[in-house]
C-alpha cells in the first residue's frame, strides 16, 4: 500500500517463490482503490493459500489478474490452493532444481510453455494437498517455512541431495 500510494498510474505486482505468494496476498488485501490500478499479478512458482484466503472478497476481486507460472515438475508452486490457472513453463533442470527461474527456458520473447505438469508434480500436488488439508493454519505455515529453510540450509536441488546433506 505504501508503494502504491507513492507510484502514479497502473501497477504490476510480482514475486518468485515465497515472494510470489506475498505478491498475490498483497494484491488481494490492499483495498479496492489500489486493486483497480493493478494490471497484473505475476506469481513465479509461489505457493497458494488455504480455502479461507481463496474465498475472501479481495482475493476474488484480483483473481482474474493473477498469472501463476510453474515449471513442469513444480513442488513449491503446487503447495496449498490456487484458483487461477497455472501456466506451465519448461525447465532445463530436474525436480527441485526447477524452482530456479534461471533454468526456465525462454524462446525469443516468452517462456517455452507446456500443456501440463509432469506425473511427479501431480503426485506431489495430490499427496501434499491431502496432507496439508489435515493441518492447522499454524502447522501449514511452519511446514512451508521448514521446507524453505531445509532447502536453503542444505543447498539441496533434489530430494536425494536434501537427504545426503541433512546431517552435514
Residue ranges and their predicted role:
Residues 23-32:
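Short glycine-enriched nucleophile-adjacent loop
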Residues 14-19, 23:
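Gly/Ala-rich beta-loop-alpha elbow adjacent to hydrolase catalytic centers
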Residues 1-11, 31-168:
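Alpha/beta hydrolase fold serine-hydrolase catalytic domain that processes acyl esters and thioesters
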